[in-house]
């Protein structure tokens, strides 16, 4: 099994909590649904913080490495912002920021010189995984704003 297959397998395993935390609220509803969405935001905040640190491992000879390091810190701080918004019950804002952060991290990673040398399977995997994570946050956002499922607006 080559390294791209291993990364792909682990990446999709890492997606399972996103799917679980976004779909289960539609099934069970009520207070547990709110808790599951909060868990999704917590998990997403951890992941985006972790992803932000990737830029520190990229080659220092890249043209924009100073920018990459700064952007990586901003993505990590956005994870803290998501947690803070969740703590203060600004769930919908945290969900929207999560979508934006994961999408922009993909754009950020795609623009790096490191990404250009990755094989096509990895590039396709990252695109699909980012899309799935963003969709999971959209599903949770729909649950949150649905007046029939959420009394917390």
PLM region spans:
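N-terminal membrane topogenic signal
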Residues: 1-14, 126
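Hydrophobic, membrane-facing alpha-helical anchors
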Residues: 23-26, 38-58
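C-terminal ends of transmembrane helices
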Residues: 52-62, 107-119
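Helix-adjacent hinge/juxtasegments
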Residues: 57-85
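Transmembrane helix-loop-helix
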Residues: 85-107
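Interfacial loop-to-transmembrane junctions
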Residues: 112-134
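Juxtamembrane boundary at the C-terminal end of a transmembrane helix
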Residues: 139-153
